[in-house]
Amino acid sequence: MPGIKEIRTKIKSVQNTRKITKAMEMVAASKMRKAQDRMRAGRPYATKVREIAAHLMQANPEYSHPYLVEREIKAVGVVLVTTDKGLCGGLNTNISRVTLAKLKEFDQRGIRVQATAFGNKGLGLLTRIGANLVSHEVQLGDKPDLDRLLGAIKVQLDAYLSGEIDALYVAATRFVNTMKQEPVFLRLLPLASGLDDPFQTGAETLADGAEVKSNYSWDYIYEPDAKSVIDDLLQRYVEGLLYQAVAENMASEQSARMVAMKAASDNAKKVIGDLQLVYNKTRQAAITKEISEIVGGAAAV
């Protein structure tokens, strides 16, 4: 049985660890609220762009943008969104497992893959497996910078427009609620005909022949022309989806970290209680032994 001093040292060590995890839990909770606000703030923008683009495409059915054209899949691009830091439960493990399964599937089908990584964890994974890494961006901080994101993703978008790849996928973690985050592997390009938002469940469909949910329907005059506006809107829509993927992942990261640190703090509290019980028993045994020795010595005299 360990001595009293050793047990006291262990208790002190676990108490110090609990202070750290408790502080990290509080920081993650604060960052989580801000990350959720940023995530939700981007949704109205994407919805309005989607509505306008759908209205334009319905009015100009003869126009076909490259982002909407289905091709035979011979090569694809994959954008893997992970965190820069750990201590967030199984968040990175789950999305990595899904991504590796898809990469294996592409390999079995003879489809070439070129990858882009956001976050240190994803970069490390793709480097270890020897993936064809064409761009990456790390140390994104707590607030995603759209310019930095677009700088890394431009390689993939240019490859799609030039025909080097026939589809673009994004692997990220969708934020469901504070306690639940789910890994998703979604096709970004070519866009679905209805311009559905892949990061919103139950998103309304704005496809050819579908209803645009609105209280009015006006025939707008677009400058310089409708096709130019469609080109610009679709580009912005794709950029918005990528930003949303990173924002969702950041909200998921802080939620997962808060939950993980709370679990660590609760476990530390339990360990402290168990050690305190062992300490009390050991101390009681030592006192009892000392009293017995004193009584035995007195009896001998």
UniProtKB/Swiss-Prot annotation:
CDD domains: F1-ATPase_gamma
Broad class of where this protein is predominantly found: membrane
Keyword entries, A-Z: ATP synthesis, Cell inner membrane, Cell membrane, CF(1), Hydrogen ion transport, Ion transport, Membrane, Transport
Membrane association type: Peripheral membrane protein
Recorded superkingdom: Bacteria
Any GO BP annotation: proton motive force-driven plasma membrane ATP synthesis
Record Pfam families: ATP-synt
Keyword Cell inner membrane attributed: yes
UniProt keyword Aminoacyl-tRNA synthetase, yes or no: no
Record-linked InterPro entries: ATP_synth_F1_ATPase_gsu, ATP_synth_F1_gsu, ATP_synth_F1_gsu_CS
Localization per Swiss-Prot or TrEMBL: Cell inner membrane
GO cellular component, one term: plasma membrane
A GO term, aspect molecular function: proton-transporting ATP synthase activity, rotational mechanism
PROSITE patterns: ATPASE_GAMMA (PS00153)
Protein's job: Produces ATP from ADP in the presence of a proton gradient across the membrane. The gamma chain is believed to be important in regulating ATPase activity and the flow of protons through the CF(0) complex.
Family note: Belongs to the ATPase gamma chain family.
PANTHER family reported for this sequence: ATP SYNTHASE GAMMA CHAIN, ATP SYNTHASE SUBUNIT GAMMA, MITOCHONDRIAL
Assembly description: F-type ATPases have 2 components, CF(1) - the catalytic core - and CF(0) - the membrane proton channel. CF(1) has five subunits: alpha(3), beta(3), gamma(1), delta(1), epsilon(1). CF(0) has three main subunits: a, b and c.
Protein name: ATP synthase gamma chain
Native source species: Bordetella petrii (strain ATCC BAA-461 / DSM 12804 / CCUG 43448)
Species lineage: Bacteria, Pseudomonadati, Pseudomonadota, Betaproteobacteria, Burkholderiales
